Structures are given as C-alpha cells and as structure tokens.
C-alpha cells in the first residue's frame, strides 16, 4: 500500500531495516472533550468515523461505538476489504461496505489531503473526522476508544466505564504487554523479512499467548472481575487468530482453539450484546488475503466454520456487579 507525500498519493518506498516490521506512529492526535477545551467539543452528529471491518485497530473503535451506543451520535463509513493497492477505498461493491455519505470521498487518502494539503505519511483507519471544521481529529485507535468510552456520557451514551481510574495503571500495563507480544507481534511475525526476525517475533507471540492462557485460568477478564478496555484490545487479535494470523502470518505453532481458557474467553467477549455484529469474518479474511504483500496470488481461502456463539465456561468466574453491559 502506498502513502501520501506532500498531499499526493504515491507508491510506498519499502523500509529495508534489517527485515523487521516497524509500525509508524499516528500523526493526528487531538481529542474530543465534553468542555471543548481541546478544540473539539463532544456533540452528537458532529463526528464521523472511517473504518474497515478487516482492520483490528479500526475494529477497536467499532466495538466501543457499539458498546457505548454511539451509533446515533457518530456516523461511520466502512471501507471495501479488497484491492488496497491505492489505499482504503469506499463503495458498495462488497456486502457491508459503504460509500462515504459525509464527504463523498472514494479514497481514504482524500480525507488526509483535505485535512492537510501537505500531509506526508501513512493513510490509516480508523480515522475520526470532524464535520464542523473538515479536519481529522485523531487516527490513533487507542485514543479514539478512550474518547468514545467517556466523552459522550453526558449526551446519553450507554453506561459503563472500560477505563476506570482505580484500574488504569494495571490496564495500561497489560495493554503494553499485549500490544508488544500479540497485537503488533502477529504483524512482526507475518511481515518479518529474515528468518531471525521471524523466529524472534513468533516466539514472542506464543509466549504472550501462553502467559494470557495462564492468567485467564484464574479470573474472568484480564484485570480481575471487571471487563475493561484491555479485554477489547486483546479481543480484536484473538478473533482474527485462527482465521488469518495462524496461516497468513505464519503463527502456526498452535491454533488459538488449542488454548482452553483463551478460546472460552474469546466466546465470552463475542457474546457481549452488540459485539457479534462488529465481527465480519468475510471482511477480515478478504482484507488480509487480498493483500499482495501477504498473499501474492490473491486467492481468498474458504474457512472452516468458526462458531463464536457456542457456550463458554467463563460464567464460573465472578463479574463485577457494578459494571453495566451494553443492552
């Protein structure tokens, strides 16, 4: 996939750095706040979310939009999962994908050029757009989910705090571990350019999975009995693991289904009201296997059935009674 250079779309120049995958930092880092002190006030109908069902980083924001009941406050455009040689594209040529009803953009990079005509860098989803100023608020998923978590509470968002202050330090700690070992670790494995880089990365992936399996043997969620942001950040990788990362990214030591506690935990989260509708395996599989870098011949495999609606055994653990799940 290419990038923008001084506001113009161009083919990407590969990074030859010792065969290891390096994820660039997000560039737009403003925040929406209830008081508008940041320059962006929380207002129903003002903001628009550009996403892909295939992308795990975008999936985080789709989940939080659903959990917090923001569908009527933050509109959303869903990119096509296939043929991303010129970046993320919008249209109705794939079930569940949409046109851009706000700006009429065909390509995601058009939003970046509109926000900054001299922008140089990657064009990514999720991207949170401000209709009032015609600018990008933020394209960092970890920050967008925090805005969705609490920024619209005064406007009637669903109850529930996925980043409670008394658990923030532990959530941050486990987030760092899961990001390095798994969220980004599967990409470091799949895009490794040398055997040494691959061996190092895949070892970290399964060390992280082993640690999480042990942790979840004695508690319902990553941070005890409370469902938090950390669980949703892990969920988006787990739900893709057997469908794409196990084969396409060469994480083949063990399938996720062989981890008893993680497999049940995944189904527990998938069955939280509102979450199943955010998981589109057709988009996920097409998105990864249509990538020339991952799968040069572009053949999209037919998967065995992955049934996340099967019963799980996680109800044997306590769940914090003060937390209200989305209805």
Positions of PLM-derived features:
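C-terminal alpha-helical interaction module
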Residues: 1-327
